[in-house]
UniProtKB/Swiss-Prot annotation:
GO terms for biological process: cell division; regulation of sporulation. GO terms for molecular function: DNA binding. It holds the Pfam family LAGLIDADG_WhiA. It comes from Micrococcus luteus (strain ATCC 4698 / DSM 20030 / JCM 1464 / CCM 169 / CCUG 5858 / IAM 1056 / NBRC 3333 / NCIMB 9278 / NCTC 2665 / VKM Ac-2230) (Micrococcus lysodeikticus). Involved in cell division and chromosome segregation. The gene is whiA. This is Probable cell division protein WhiA. Signal peptide: none annotated. Belongs to the WhiA family. NCBIfam families: DNA_bind_WhiA (TIGR00647). Keywords: Cell cycle, Cell division, DNA-binding. Residues 275-308 bind DNA. Disulfide bonds: none annotated.
């Protein structure tokens, strides 16, 4: 929870001058934190957030972009909920706001995913969509085996749209249903840091990387303390050589690497001291150690074949250097 609040605190302060990006962020916040209600025949837009600065940012954007005056109601946490919740409502002009932000179409019908304009915008607008989604319903957990950057979505259509937006930012995300709730999850360590930086959370990205590195160092120290010194040296040397070969293979192949082989290679590079068995457990979804070893072998073989065709040093050159 601490990292989530740190992230939202930083995102709520990200300056955005361009109107298209502000509109994209606002629309995303309303989509992922909001809902539509009919009150006495009028459309009311409502959004519920757990962070004061975020709801104030949303209110300011709605006022400045659309000339409307949202009201904010503070709801104290009860037995099942910790902390305060902030409910933003737009009653007067709610239908116009819903239409302009893509919550309903021109005929007044609810839009289930994200409006086409949000999905096909510029890179900056795409980052704004993710920033809005994180402010609305995002969470960031501590580095470790269960580390994740996650957004709870109102439905599968919005989840798939957010996955597509992540892809445009060169980040692999997955849509999942967890306890009857649709979510978008980013688990790869480097991908999490990349996405955090893309949405403007540079300080949180740095903090997350530092904690991740410290955790890996501690885990490595704890694991290696159980080994005999000679075995330790041999294991460490083998891991360094394997990592160097994989790095050389990815360099040789560039964009030609199949996704499943690239994933195995990135696992090896991100966890250089881990055994194949541990790499398999770290994979998402988990793999056997034989499956991990097989993918890495195929990656190296593919790279060596391509290196031979191009007349350049293969993967063995990395370990020799």
């Amino acid at each position: 929870m601490a990292l989530t609040m740190t992230l939202k605190e930083e995102l709520a302060r990200v300056p955005v001058a361009a109107t298209p990006e502000r509109r994209a962020e606002t629309a995303a916040m309303l989509r992922f934190a909001g809902g539509l209600h009919l009150v006495a025949g009028r459309v009311v837009v409502e959004a519920e957030l757990d962070h004061g600065a975020s709801v104030r940012r949303l209110r300011a954007a709605i006022t400045e972009l659309y000339g409307l005056a949202p009201e904010i109601v503070v709801v104290s946490g009860g037995n099942l909920r910790r902390g305060q919740r902030y409910v933003l409502r737009v009653v007067r002009g709610g239908e116009d706001l819903a239409r302009q932000t893509g919550l309903i179409d021109q005929r007044g019908r609810p839009v289930r995913g994200l409006a086409p304009a949000l999905v096909s915008g510029t890179t900056a607008a795409t980052a704004a969509v993710w920033r809005g989604a994180l402010l609305a319903h995002g969470s960031l957990t501590e580095p470790g085996r269960s580390a994740a950057l996650e957004v709870t979505t109102p439905g599968p259509e919005a989840a798939l749209a957010l996955v597509g937006a992540a892809r445009r930012l060169h980040v692999a995300a997955k849509a999942r249903e967890v306890r009857q709730s649709d979510r978008v999850v980013v688990r790869d360590g480097e991908a999490i840091a990349t996405l955090l930086a893309a949405v403007g959370a540079e300080q949180t990205a740095t903090l997350w990387r530092e904690r991740r590195e410290r955790k890996e160092v501690r885990a490595t120290a704890n694991r290696l303390a159980n080994f005999d010194d000679a075995n330790l040296r041999r294991s460490a040397q083998a891991a360094v050589m394997a990592g160097a070969k994989v790095e050389r293979a990815l360099e040789i192949l560039g964009d030609e690497v199949p996704d499943h082989l690239r994933y195995a290679g990135r696992l090896r590079l991100e966890h250089k001291q881990a055994s194949l068995d541990e790499l398999g457990r770290l994979a998402d979804p988990p793999m056997t150690k034989d499956a991990v070893a097989g993918r890495i072998r195929r990656l190296l073989a593919m790279a060596d074949k391509r290196a031979a065709e191009r007349g350049i040093p293969g993967t063995d050159a990395a370990s020799e250097g």
